[in-house]
Amino acid sequence: MAIHLYKTSTPSTRNGAVDSQVKSNPRNNLIYGQHRCGKGRNARGIITAGHRGGGHKRLYRKIDFRRNEKDIYGRIVTIEYDPNRNAYICLIHYGDGEKRYILHPRGAIIGDTIVSGTEVPIKMGNALPLTDMPLGTAIHNIEITLGKGGQLARAAGAVAKLIAKEGKSATLKLPSGEVRLISKNCSATVGQVGNAGVNQKSLGRAGSKCWLGKRPVVRGVVMNPVDHPHGGGEGRAPIGRKKPATPWGYPALGRRSRKRNKYSDNLILRRRSK
């Protein structure tokens, strides 16, 4: 990721940084308008996810997560910014005239060629089934269900590792630290998702975060008792209980929120690390 630092003319530009060498000029046939409803509310209008709201209007880019252009070579034409995700996207021109967006693999540059299929080279950006990959391969955009498209390891900088193959299943170590089984026939893309340093970029000011649809974060201890279990008291008061709690009164730190008796419990060999 190429970072451009501003000259220190104002406090905002002194601390801010933007991505350079990445344009945002999407193709008209690969975008469509998307109504962003809710803003962290449920169907009754009650806040269920805090600190969300506002933000600039966005056009959704159609991303090819399935990579079903089999055995047809494509060339990376552009590397573009996508407002709907932290990762960059690449515009691919295939040999049969098809044009699609894919997630930008880290290290890929304009002019590189990619291909998807069953017997393709183990090269960055190529997509192939897990059964054809050697152990230790770094992968992203991993399918959970055959033919449904990649669902795992799609965020900026995400990378998983193929650590074992036995029977009909392959064992993967995911970015969260979770180790789980997936069918060997599912496909994945070789390499790591690009823009790995996005979490180190400084926005510089509150307005830049508002453009992204992120509202200010307020501590519960400075709220009123009606708004948060930590609220109330005179001056700087402690939270008034043994353990921290969420705004709805549930234990805040370390409580497991995964549903019990899920179908995938037998597929998870080791839970994700905190």
Curated annotation (Swiss-Prot):
Its main location: plastid. Transmembrane segments: none annotated. It is found in: Plastid, Chloroplast. Keywords: Chloroplast, Plastid, Ribonucleoprotein, Ribosomal protein. GO terms for molecular function: rRNA binding; structural constituent of ribosome; transferase activity. GO terms for biological process: translation. Pfam families: Ribosomal_L2, Ribosomal_L2_C. Residues 1-25, 224-274 are annotated as: Disordered. One of its GO terms (cellular component) is large ribosomal subunit. Part of the 50S ribosomal subunit. Belongs to the universal ribosomal protein uL2 family. This is Large ribosomal subunit protein uL2cz/uL2cy. It comes from Cucumis sativus (Cucumber).
